[in-house]
Amino acid sequence: SGLTSLTLPSSVTSIGWATFSGCSGLTSLTLPSSVTSIDGRAFYGCSSLFGLTLPSSVTSIGSSAFEGCRSLFSLTLPSSVTEIGESAFRGCHSLASLTLPSSVTEIGESAFRGCSGLTSLTLPSSVTSIGKSAFEGCSGLTSIYVSWESPLSIDASTFKDANTGKCILYVPKGTYDDYWLSNWGIFENIVEYDATGIDHITTSGEAKEISRYAADGQRLEVPAKGLNIVKYSDGSVKKVVVQ
């Protein structure tokens, strides 16, 4: 528990099982670009870890790798990550927003269970599997953006105990009925939007910005840090992440 910061040498290629489990004093973490995998329970219970940026070499995050990192507020996943293991970020209730890169194909069971501070979630169309209870207990969610033209099959427990009456589910244009008739239909507010920019953000040509909103739907006068939703004069809506 006395370890507060950690910088690993470039010779390290993987973080083994439970290597830093229980290092409750660890607040900052720098991983070298040589690391390709973070194994199960690697940072389990590192309750003081605040921000986490993984190098672009990491492809997999093991089961319970960051479970119980209750101070984790900022999470940046690189476009190399393809798999998020079971309970990988379970109980990280300080995590506020999450945009998964378009490389992710699998989200394990209970991966983000109990992340009650999570307000905004963006799921790319690359995801082909979401495990049971993956987002159970994410009671703070106010917006979810998906871009599957055909709803991905999910278990009834996937969003259990989320505020499905308040949270807005944004789906691609022309897919409202399909989502409403699937397990995604638990969300009372389903809104269609232009999902073309959800995986690859592009500029909107000659179109001009006409309005901007925060992830919770609040109108913004100027760009704000985090996820911004921008409406353009040609009718398109784009997701923009402001650093």
Model-derived regions: residue spans:
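Consensus positions within tandem repeat domains that build extended binding/scaffold surfaces
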Residues: 16-21, 39-44, 62-67, 85-90, ...
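A structural signal for leucine-rich repeat
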Residues: 157-162, 182
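A recurrent domain-boundary module in secreted/ectodomain proteins
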Residues: 180-197
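Acidic surface patches and DE-rich sequence motifs
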Residues: 202, 214, 223, 232-234
